[in-house]
Regions:
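Catalytic nucleophile-elbow at a beta strand-turn-alpha helix junction centered on a G-D-S/GDSL motif
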Residues: 173-189
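N-terminal secretory targeting modules
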Residues: 1-175
Length: 189
């Protein structure tokens, strides 16, 4: 089969950043705001390990899948790159890698979808990707974590002369606990 990305650029997966002016930041540092997951024993998790173990084997198995996790910040960079370290990749025959292992980028208070950081097909332990904008402008960025993969580290790459600021918090700061199936999550609807 020929490389369809040579015919249609929408099929191209950028895995070599080639960014001379990139500066990477660890999302555990200020000014990043993390929601929906927290860091424990080397992984981002949806709930503490001990609680997950005490609920059921199924909850234990899925508690380090990062569905619902997101990081927010404000920048004027003309691109946002990621470097994700992922010790477990959720590859399934009925589910695309963009959902199970990709990160989605949204812009603005209403979090309008821009594009997905698409993992390469041969992903084994993480990937790098970049999303470019047409111009330099102040943007509130939200990056959603993958649905069915584990993430041990995430670094955000921006132009080294771009500013990086804390994003405004959510209007309602109290967490909402919502339980549902994979259909509710959007995984297998």
């Amino acid at each position: 089969m020929s490389d369809i990305s040579k015919i249609d650029r929408n099929f191209h997966v950028e895995s070599n950043l080639n960014l001379a002016d990139v500066k990477f930041y660890d999302i555990q540092d200020e000014p990043f705001s993390l929601y929906g997951v927290f860091y424990e024993n080397g992984l981002y998790r949806r709930m503490p390990e001990q609680i997950a173990k005490s609920v059921s084997p199924q909850v234990w198995q899925l508690h380090d899948n990062t569905a619902g996790g997101r990081v927010k910040f404000v920048t004027n960079s003309r691109y946002v790159a990621i470097r994700a370290i992922m010790p477990q990749i959720g590859k399934m025959p009925h589910f695309p890698l963009t959902g199970s292992a990709g990160f989605d980028l949204y812009v603005g208070r209403k979090e309008e979808y821009v594009k997905t950081f698409t993992p390469p097909f041969a992903i084994t332990d993480g990937f790098e990707s970049v999303i470019r904008f047409d111009s330099r402008a102040k943007r509130e960025i939200t990056i959603n974590f993958p649905l069915y993969s584990a993430v041990s580290a995430l670094y955000i790459g921006l132009e080294e002369d771009a500013f990086l600021k804390k994003a405004p918090g959510y209007v309602e700061e109290k967490p909402i606990v919502f339980y549902g199936s994979s259909i509710t999550q959007g995984g297998c609807a």
